[in-house]
Amino acid sequence: MKRTVLLIVMCCLAFGGHVFAALGESDDQIAELFGKPIDQGVPDKKGITTNVYEKGNYIILVQFLKGYSMAESYTRVDKQEFSDKEISAFLEGSSNERPWNKQPDKQAWERSDHKATAWLQTLSGRPTLLIQAQ
């Protein structure tokens, strides 16, 4: 199963397909990538809407402010750890063509323009990659 998911991720990257969300994309662009949310959120007091999507072996949460994504989280349905290649693919998808710099001795990254951070954290027993605009 891991090999199949990795193969799909690598093929999509190799053929230049846009398969991962990028911070700042509209809710329509996110829906084109992930389909209809399995849980459509409603705006909170700050106007932030959190939608939940499921695509392939991943559960994806995307937070929107004024219709544009400001944070994303990715977790595997099977609760397995992410491979380095999966992490790289998700970060690349949210790079906006800027490199990510890994923090020493941590599973955390900062985008070179200092406008986004990412980190790995276990939430509800699931390894989760979180990506957030600053």
Predicted regions and their residues:
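Sec/Tat signal peptide C-region and signal peptidase I cleavage site
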Residues: 15-21
